[in-house]
């Protein structure tokens, strides 16, 4: 996560974060790193399409009602790419066959751990909320 936050700062993205991992989350470190890495890559990509004065990133990772909440919100130009099935795609590559790979991986991890995900693609802000059940 440190490398991604450094990349965001290098790209003049203003960052607000609140990060607190409870002891009783049950997501493997590898899956958690993959999930956060993909989310931050998408947020940084979206911000880099904007004027430097509009670049914002908000990260919240914390316990919430017996769940682990991951919330990522970033500035956006409001232009989104959707696949034939209506799913959001990312555009980090010019190869159309590779669009949406990160989002596919995010969805796989959420499903693997019985989580819930919600994408909110708005005009100036894009946000992702993910909830995972915590162990008792």
What is each stretch, according to the model?
Residues 1-11:
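Short beta-to-alpha transition helix within the HATPase_c
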Residues 8, 44-52:
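A short, flexible helix-to-loop-to-beta junction within the catalytic ATP-binding CA
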Residues 15-35:
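Conserved short strand/loop->alpha-helix "switch" segment adjacent to the catalytic nucleotide/phosphoryl-transfer site
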Residues 54-66:
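Short beta-strand/loop element within the Bergerat-fold HATPase_c
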Residues 66-100:
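Glycine-rich/acidic phosphate-handling loop/turn and adjacent ATP-lid/helix
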Residues 78, 122-129:
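Glycine-rich nucleotide-binding loop
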């Amino acid at each position: 996560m440190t490398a991604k936050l450094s990349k965001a700062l290098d790209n003049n993205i203003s960052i607000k974060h609140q990060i607190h991992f409870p002891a009783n989350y049950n997501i493997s470190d590898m899956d958690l790193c993959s999930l956060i890495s993909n989310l931050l890559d998408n947020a940084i990509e979206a911000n880099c399409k904007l004027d430097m004065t509009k670049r914002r990133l908000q990260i919240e990772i914390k316990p919430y009602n017996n769940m682990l909440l991951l919330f990522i919100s970033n500035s956006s130009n409001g232009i989104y790419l959707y696949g034939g099935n209506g799913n959001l795609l990312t555009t980090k590559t010019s190869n159309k066959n590779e669009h949406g790979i990160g989002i596919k991986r995010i969805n796989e991890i959420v499903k693997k751990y019985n989580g819930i995900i919600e994408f909110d693609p708005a005009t100036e802000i894009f946000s992702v909320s993910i909830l995972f059940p915590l162990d008792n």
